[in-house]
Amino acid sequence: MNAELKEIDGKYVATLSGELDTAAATTAEEVLKPLMQSNGKDVDIECKDLEYIASSGLRILIGILKAAKASGSKVTMRNVSDDIQNVFKLTGFINLFDFE
């Protein structure tokens, strides 16, 4: 699992790759921690190379979404594979996020 966070053009861009499983969640959460603070910046989460997401990974994304909504910003999931989208569908989270 690799998680990277950058600020580009006034918004955050998080890139996730590999497997966001329970073992990787702590590291990913530490990298993405700034996104869980209300700051008013929109967030793009690039998932092109994300191969797997566990419930602990979903918990991190929900935390990011809650913080964004509290500050009036939005979270956009980008380039999400069909397999990962199916996880969002099965958990009922598909309608919570914007997908592009």
What does each model-found stretch correspond to?
Residues M1-E4, I94-E100:
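Short hydrophobic/aromatic patches at helix-to-coil boundaries
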Residues I8, R78-V80, E100:
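Conserved beta-strand termini and adjacent loop/short-helix elements that scaffold enzyme active sites
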Residues T22-L96:
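Amphipathic alpha-helical interaction surfaces in cytosolic regulatory modules
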